[in-house]
């Protein structure tokens, strides 16, 4: 095992793979986590993200997940894996992998700037991708906005770090308390789809409240009450309560209900101006009523197109 301080190298450092003999030059440090340090790098042909591992076994687990995703057609949850090897430096061996460099904005930053509707769209995208991950036998584990990136250009959510990915049935070892159902006393840390789904709901709480909150003496009731009283969460309280209570066993189930509630909420929002005009029709001419109805119809149609582009 290698300490994180031992994984900090100067820009321009050249890495040579022990087995595959590929060369990579480190351009700049991108970040460090519990299991390693990531650099922007360059191979002979392209820009890459290079992860130097603190623990070889953890890296092997992450590489195996990325390989499985590479076998799926049209997957888009994580980065493409280009290479994984060992680097011999000063008598020590550091395991590393070279991956697709994902250029964008961390979801944790995007959620602070975007309207709440976007948070729902991002979670819908995430649920589609989690369905694929669960299908091949893994849960994400440490699912949180900091481990997700919003691609630029476009509004596609991708994952930056599969270090916490865990095989179904095993115990999740890497987690962040706020997004962990074990912390909230609402289920254990067994790797199953519902573990990731709970984290998705907590992303909605974070987006709606603008911060992480502390648990109370009755955490389950605390979360349910928030879903019923927080204005931005109220339209989605059915999905939130079902998830908190562990009623969804597949990401596709949660996604179906969340999409339905999002469309219903948007339809209701667009109908309110028309209803206001109808209540005042004694004071309003027929043409203005038609205008309000037409405007609402156009807005609803535009929103449906938006959903098709970014969600479906």
Task: For each feature predicted by the language model, list its residue ranges.
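Terminal C-lobe "cap" of eukaryotic-type protein kinase domains
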Residues: 248-268
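Conserved short submotifs of the Hanks-type protein kinase catalytic core
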Residues: 90-106
């Amino acid at each position: 095992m290698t300490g994180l301080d031992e994984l900090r190298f100067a820009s321009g450092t050249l890495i040579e793979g022990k087995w595959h003999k590929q060369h990579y030059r480190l351009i700049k440090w991108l970040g460090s986590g519990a299991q390693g340090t990531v650099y922007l790098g360059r191979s002979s042909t392209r820009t890459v993200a290079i992860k130097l591992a603190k623990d070889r076994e953890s890296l092997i687990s992450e590489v195996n997940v990325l390989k499985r995703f590479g076998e799926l057609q049209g997957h888009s949850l994580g980065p493409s894996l280009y290479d994984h090897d060992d680097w011999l430096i000063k008598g020590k061996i550091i395991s590393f992998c070279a991956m697709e460099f994902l250029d964008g904005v961390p979801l944790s930053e995007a959620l602070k700037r975007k309207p709440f509707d976007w948070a729902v769209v991002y979670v819908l995208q995430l649920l589609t991708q989690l369905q694929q991950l669960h299908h091949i036998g893994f849960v994400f584990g440490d699912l949180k906005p900091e481990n997700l990136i919003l691609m630029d250009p476009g509004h596609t959510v991708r994952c930056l770090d599969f270090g916490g990915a865990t095989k179904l049935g095993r115990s999740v070892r890497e987690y962040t308390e706020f997004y962990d159902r074990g912390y909230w006393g609402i289920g254990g840390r067994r790797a199953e789809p519902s573990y990731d789904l709970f984290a998705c709901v907590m992303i909605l709480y974070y987006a709606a409240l603008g911060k992480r909150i502390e648990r109370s003496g009755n955490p389950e009731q605390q979360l349910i009450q928030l879903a019923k009283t927080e204005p931005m969460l109220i339209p989605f309280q059915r999905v939130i309560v079902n998830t908190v209570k562990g009623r969804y066993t597949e990401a596709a189930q949660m996604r179906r209900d969340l999409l339905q509630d999002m469309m219903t909420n948007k339809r209701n929002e667009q109908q309110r101006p028309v209803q206001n005009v109808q209540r005042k029709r004694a004071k309003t001419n027929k043409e203005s009523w038609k205008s309000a109805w037409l405007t609402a119809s156009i807005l609803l149609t535009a929103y449906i197109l938006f959903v098709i582009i970014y969600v479906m």
